[in-house]
Amino acid sequence: MERARDRLHLRRTTEQHVPEVEVQVKRRRTASLNNQECHVYLRRSQQQQVPVVDFQAELIQAFLAETPRGG
């Protein structure tokens, strides 16, 4: 009886481990897709010659304006 129970337990644990790997693979796929999208976006911005530095400065100013000073 104990051996059969051990086998059942082993089978259950292996079945539980399989989907985790699938999830990791899916995550990797989406990550690589996102990277490609980023590269495409970067190429577009280079073609349009968007001033990225100015945009960053604007972001910082907006962030500072929103955060309450003197905590």
Curated annotation (Swiss-Prot):
Keywords: Nucleus. This is SNRPN upstream reading frame protein. Pfam families: SNURF (PF07192). Its main location: nucleus. It comes from Bos taurus. InterPro entries: SNURF. It is found in: Nucleus. Belongs to the SNURF family. Encoded on a bicistronic transcript that code for two proteins, SNRPN and SNURF.
